[in-house]
Amino acid sequence: MIMKRILTILALSLLCLTSNAQLVWKISGNGTKKPSYILGTHHGCPFTYCDSIPGLMKAFDKVDNIIGEINMIELAEMSPERMQKMQAMMMMPADTSLLSLFNKEETVKVNAWLIKELGANLEMLSMMNPMTIMVTVQNKVMMEVIPDVADMTTIDKYMQTLGQSKGKTIGELETTDYQMELLYGNSLEEQADALLEMIDLGNSKELMIQLTDAYKSQNLDTLWEIFQEQMTGYEYDAIVKVRNLNWEKQMKELL
């Protein structure tokens, strides 16, 4: 049975629930026997920032369970079969052309943007589906803003690894399969529309810099404003709205 004292680690998509200038929230009252805590994290922020989050380690010492967005320890031990399944979801189906998802005007727009961002056009990226292209560009932007992001230990992984070393139970609110379905579950046409919307939004690098700075300064009002600017409608529904509702239900059961 899951113990009642829990530290739940969630990505920034949870931050829309509050405007308080803090990253750790205490959950108590309303029938709960022992307090639990929520930690808001940023995947582009290294674990060394934990020392700058007031109350984090005190909360960590009080809990018996660490519940993450996903289990980062299991993710590092993913089987080759699961990796192949994920890679297949990122590719265009053999019977559909990436170019067929865009009209002539859209193709010109997408190609100009892709050449600027990735040095390639739709024809050169023909094996990728639109969502994979979006993720690739977003990862590139993050690496430009945070050059060592690929090698660093994130806050999520650090807290789970530390928890495991202290004998705490490690759990998750989502599986990687569920997250992949969130990203790639919509039709190719909807993914293409989301890509066009991402191009129209622009300023992704500047927004990533602002997002990281706002997180480090724990300015949640600014974080939420940036999220609203940066996210397409497709991303907001999939990454924030639906997941927050699911997390709320699960957290009530855990508490």
Predicted regions and their residues:
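Positively charged n-region of N-terminal signal peptides that target proteins for export
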Residues: 1-6
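A short, acidic, amphipathic alpha-helical segment used as a generic capping/interface helix at domain edges
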Residues: 241-255
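Structured, acidic catalytic/metal-binding patches in enzyme active sites
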Residues: 23-242
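N-terminal hydrophobic alpha-helix used for membrane targeting or insertion
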Residues: 9-11, 30
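Hydrophobic h-region of N-terminal signal peptides that target proteins for export
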Residues: 11-20
